Amino acid sequence: MRVALGIEYCGTGFHGWQSQAGGGTVQDALEAALGEVAGVPVGVLCAGRTDAGVHATHQVAHFDAPVDRPLTAWVRGVNSHLPEGVAVRWAQPVAEDFHARFSARGRRYRYLLLNRPQRPGLWQGRVGWFHWPLELEAMQEACLRLLGEHDFSAFRAANCQAKSPVKHMSRAEVRQCGNMFVFDFEASAFLHHMVRNLVGTLVYIGKGTQQPDWIEALLQTKDRKLAAPTFSPDGLYFRGPVYEPHWGLPDPNDDFLDGMLK
């Protein structure tokens, strides 16, 4: 039986999602916990790999269950073996042709940016931080220029392994909640470091170093060296993949970020 899992995690202290030789990743922790419940090794595939320090409110992964277990075992049982900072929220049987990554038609990210002179204390590791005042309207105007299909090479990490830099951006927004700026992005897929590079560029525009039309120039030049530096991973949240309704997976729109930041 193929099983899909909904997972949330705090990326602080983990070396990203993807398993690596030295361990210390979210995937390593999840597979170890699944193995404890199953009694045999279990491998998982996820919807979107996250970097070190990046969080997730609704990561989705799937695996082929090697043994018969009730769904509660894949939630409560697995959670009892997971380290702090990682939790399975739900488990659901899916069709054999479901794939956490390839069945997704889009992905969503949110970036939380604390904008005040003092660095974060309570929110340390959970938000990005910028000390200089930012102009909301300028960043909102720049976001509009990101919508549609573009070559996002100017926002692509040098070691990005994506076959094509062309992606379709269906949502690019920024709003202000007190001294917190909330950036939301949804696209068919994202390049490595793409969201953090976009946020860094929007911050340059918000502080007045560049104008909103700088976005268009960067998209045209396709030169990563001309864009702003990559922003901190601390405030980045993978809010999950977007699937067609027929897969019957839970709605990811119930995470705490929606309730807090409206």
UniProtKB/Swiss-Prot annotation:
Its EC number is 5.4.99.12. Transmembrane segments: none annotated. It is an enzyme of class 5 (isomerase). Substrate binds at Y109. Keywords: Isomerase, tRNA processing. It holds the Pfam family PseudoU_synth_1. One of its GO terms (biological process) is tRNA pseudouridine synthesis. Belongs to the tRNA pseudouridine synthase TruA family. Homodimer. This is tRNA pseudouridine synthase A. The gene is truA.
